[in-house]
């Protein structure tokens, strides 16, 4: 193996650049050439490749987003499109690929491996919804951004004795909502994986105001319903002023946290070593604080398990 490629796919996440940097520097240390593939699998098929050197990645560790750019490219599920991508890799002399992204990105990495190009996947998504890893690149940064935003929302909520329903990302996974909800002292956390009772939440808010509290915060994962709809449901059971706020894409931006930088660096370094050992079709994860690997195929049948005990902790916090 003399040359490897790296791409980012799907939604961007803080820490992707740190992973790209780690892959590049590790590969060069082991005598390999590195090419960045711009715009994900779309760029792979188009042959949009750029050489990466220590000099052009070294300062990227503190930057959010992905300087290789990203794109969603569902067409890569088609066999003939995959073959075009493999032909581009052969044309450029690239022997293996590291893919950073979420579930769809892993499908692409597995397809490349099946076509004879060893590929390793790194979990890059703020949702933290990948099976067999406790952590995905970007999750910690997204939580910090959401927490900072809710701290500011609380200031204005307290000034007007208002309730805010704050919508955070997480279509099928409530990890951001749970962690941020506990960290921001939310009155309620609502996620798609667990049942909830709007009436009980309204009663909790009402009791808080009666006890002298001057605001209410509900953290709502986007996969449950819109913040506006939840607010309207809430007001059927409570006599208070309520507003909806959607944090949306701001959660993907910003400089990555220490946790994201360190873990992305460790994962990127490890991924290169897996390729050097001739391994492919693997996903790198972090389990119990340690690097781990699983066959990508296993991820498709697996299920992410969040730290749902946080809901119980937060419920106790709201009773007093």
Swiss-Prot record:
What residues sit in the active site?
127 (proton acceptor)
| UniProt entry tagged with the keyword Transcription regulation | no
Regulation of protein activity:
Allosterically activated by ADP and other diphosphonucleosides, and allosterically inhibited by phosphoenolpyruvate.
Annotated residues for binding of Mg(2+): 103
InterPro entries per the UniProt record, alphabetical: ATP_PFK, ATP_PFK_prok-type, PFKA_ATP_prok, Phosphofructokinase_CS, Phosphofructokinase_dom, PKF_sf
What subcellular locations does the record give? Answer: Cytoplasm
Q: What is its EC number?
A: 2.7.1.11
Q: Which residues bind substrate?
A: 125-127, 162, 169-171, 222, 243, 249-252
Swiss-Prot/TrEMBL keywords: Allosteric enzyme, ATP-binding, Cytoplasm, Glycolysis, Kinase, Magnesium, Metal-binding, Nucleotide-binding, Transferase
Binding, ADP: 21-25, 154, 185-187, 213-215
Q: Which residues bind ATP?
A: 11, 72-73, 102-105
Q: Where does it sit, as one GO cellular component term?
A: 6-phosphofructokinase complex
Q: What class of enzyme is it?
A: transferase
Q: Enumerate the cofactors the protein uses.
A: Mg(2+)
Q: Which reaction does it catalyse?
A: beta-D-fructose 6-phosphate + ATP = beta-D-fructose 1,6-bisphosphate + ADP + H(+)
- PROSITE patterns per UniProt: PHOSPHOFRUCTOKINASE
The biological processes this protein is annotated with in GO are: canonical glycolysis; fructose 1,6-bisphosphate metabolic process; fructose 6-phosphate metabolic process
Principal localization?
A: cytoplasm
Describe the protein's quaternary organization and the partners it interacts with.
Homotetramer.
Write out the similarity annotation.
Belongs to the phosphofructokinase type A (PFKA) family. ATP-dependent PFK group I subfamily. Prokaryotic clade 'B1' sub-subfamily.
NCBIfam families recorded: PFKA_ATP (TIGR02482), PRK03202.1 (NF002872)
**The protein's role, per its UniProt record:** Catalyzes the phosphorylation of D-fructose 6-phosphate to fructose 1,6-bisphosphate by ATP, the first committing step of glycolysis.
Please identify the protein, giving its name as recorded: ATP-dependent 6-phosphofructokinase
Species annotation: Lactobacillus helveticus (strain DPC 4571)
Coding gene? pfkA
């Amino acid at each position: 193996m003399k040359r490897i490629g790296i791409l980012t796919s799907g939604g961007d996440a803080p820490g992707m650049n740190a992973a790209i940097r780690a892959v590049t520097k590790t590969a060069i240390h082991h005598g390999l050439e590195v090419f960045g593939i711009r715009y994900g699998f779309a760029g792979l098929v188009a042959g949009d490749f750029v050489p990466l050197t220590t000099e052009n990645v070294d300062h990227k560790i503190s930057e959010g987003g992905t300087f290789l750019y990203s794109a969603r490219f569902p067409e890569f599920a088609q066999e003939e499109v995959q073959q075009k991508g493999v032909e581009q890799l052969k044309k450029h002399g690239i022997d293996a690929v590291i893919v950073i992204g979420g579930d769809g990105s892993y499908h692409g990495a597995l397809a490349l491996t099946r076509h004879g190009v060893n590929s390793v996947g790194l979990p890059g998504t703020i949702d933290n919804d990948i099976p067999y890893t406790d952590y995905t690149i970007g999750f910690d940064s997204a939580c910090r951004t959401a927490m900072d935003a809710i701290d500011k929302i609380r200031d204005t909520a307290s000034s007007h004795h208002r309730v805010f329903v704050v919508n955070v990302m997480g279509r099928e996974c409530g990890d951001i909502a749970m962690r941020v909800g506990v960290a921001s002292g939310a009155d309620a956390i609502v996620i798609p994986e667990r049942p909830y009772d709007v009436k009980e939440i309204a009663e909790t808010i009402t009791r808080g105001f009666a006890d002298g509290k001057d605001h209410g915060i509900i953290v709502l994962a986007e996969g449950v319903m819109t913040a506006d709809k939840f607010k309207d449901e809430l007001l059927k059971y409570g006599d208070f002023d309520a507003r909806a706020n959607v944090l949306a894409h701001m959660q993907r931006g910003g400089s990555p946290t220490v946790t994201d930088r360190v873990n992305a660096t460790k994962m990127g370094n490890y991924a290169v070593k897996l390729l050097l050992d001739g391994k492919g079709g693997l996903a790198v994860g972090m389990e119990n604080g340690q690097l781990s690997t699983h066959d990508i195929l296993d991820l498709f049948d697996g299920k992410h398990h969040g730290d749902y005990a946080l809901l119980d902790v937060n419920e106790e916090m709201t009773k007093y």
